[in-house]
Amino acid sequence: MKNAKRTLALLLALVMSLSLLAGCGNQDNTSGGATTDETPLVVGYSPFSSKFSPFFSETAYDQDVYAMTQLGLLTSDRTGAIIYKGIEGETVNYNGTDYTYYGPADLEVVENADGTVDYNFTLREDLKFSDGEPLTVDDVIFSMYVLCDPTYEGNSTLYAQPIVGMAEYRAGMTTLSKALAAAGRDNTDFTNWTEEQQTKFWDNFDKGLVPFAQEICDYVVSAGAAAETDSVAAKASQWGFTLADDATVEDFAMAIGEQYGWIFSAMEAETAGSALSDLMDADVYNDYPVMGVKTGESADSITGIKKIDDYHMTVTMTKVDAVAIYQLGISIAPMHYYGNKDLYDYDNNSFGFPKGDLSSVRAKTTQPMGAGPYKFIKFENGTVYFEANENYFQGAPKTKYVNFLECISDDDKLNGVTTGTIDITDPSMSSDTADAIATANSNGELTGDKVTTDLVNNLGYGYIGMNSVVMSVGGEPSSQASKDLRKAFGTILSVYRDVAIDSYYGERASVINYPISDTSWAAPRPSDDGYKVAFSTDVNGNDIYTSDMSAEDKYAAAKTAALGYLEAAGYTVADGKVTAAPEGAKMEYEVWIPADGKGDHPSFM
């Protein structure tokens, strides 16, 4: 029923797209004439959300903004491999060329006899933030404690790594919204919160989250996915929620809250129209999900994060974890800016902010600062302004000024380049985009006097998602019959991938068979043992296709295989047609294709 964000299972990887990077062909097409040190580099960007925080950013575009200002504890080479000797630098060959990489720290990894692992960091001693303040281990520790705070709700998962003492530190504390929801509206113990706070929470639940859930039920009915007389559970199932048969709309609202850890802003993803923020009081919506409440005993510090001196520290993990090292490469945020230096006393377990209170960090969400190559100046009238950081450890960038300019659409990005108001941007590549670029250039090519293009592999892929609750037999998503139903659809949809992608992208994209971009080193290859084309076997495990089949032969073979899956799922199949559905399944399912609301999608054939 819902858009791709609500899919419960990956069906298949449709396409590994190619992105376009477009820039001015020559200086005559820039907006400012002759280039000088004062001329900014203008980059066309998709819209921002103003969460430019190394801790709380959400969109990739906001992350790019803060990344301009930040310095990561670790750096990597062009293949993603970690650089362990960042201070002296490491030289690594890539495609026949040697590249030397520098970073703010050296890292030594020691596997101990007891199974624990020490990550020993040594920082450069000349690092400074963009405001001139020195960067030390204290800033690293502050940043780690923010990411590991019990009330932290950002995208980092450092707190989930097997760091010694992490569980003990995060125990005994939760957020006010979680605690109130767990206690229930009839709670009479006001040790950890006031009666007024509890009353306000449930008042907002009734006037905000319950109508929010009811609107979803109403939408499902209006869309024809359920009848008005159907139960709340039946309506909620169309939205991906499994509830008891006798569930009320209040139960549905509770399920939404629990799904998102009682973070109201995150619940907005479930909207059927209204913004939850418009239905609730601002303080409950914004503050309750991030306000720490002590519920029991907890450790005062994370024993596995140890300061040795101002430039040396060790992080100890309980076991070897291949991906943990990547989680340690955090942005080193300035404690004096995001926290409070007066509240930092390592020896007395104080780390720059009160445990359970990240308000000082959140207050700087829209104005990032760090030790990265650029300083954030302002975000004004749709433009983010940066200036080179004179204190950057590798020297100030040669391009003194950089502007990120918001563009509403890909057309805006392309028009900006052709008119000279944008120097470089990344519109999504399609045949229409390619035609527009060729038309702009006098030579009719993708690179010419107006626009220079550079096609790069996109580290991503498209896919079709199927809601396993909706597409099930007998209300049992995990049953074999339900799986066979979904495999029938997967078999039919997958066989048309080649023609869909070829007609829309041409040579600019390729079909993949596993949910991982072909640009990744971990992507399966056709030469690997066990490699299979997606949905290429029938219900008995036999291959559907042969190498000499024409496209039409493949379509016919896929149809036969799909009918076999449907029959196994309990459907009635006669003379190559499906005539009846089993109980708890349907003869018709709805497919949603976003396509920017104008059919701009390879699935529109």
Language-model features, listed with the residues they occupy:
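Bacterial signal peptide processing site
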Residues: 25-27
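N-terminal lobe/hinge region of extracytoplasmic solute-binding protein
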Residues: 44-114, 369
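Extracellular/periplasmic solute-recognition and catalytic clefts
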Residues: 45, 377-390, 403-472, 496, ...
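Aromatic- and charge-enriched surface segment that lines or borders ligand/interaction sites
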Residues: 105-276, 314, 416, 478-481, ...
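Append "and occasionally in soluble cytosolic enzymes with long acidic Gly/Pro-rich linkers
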Residues: 377, 385-387, 481-605
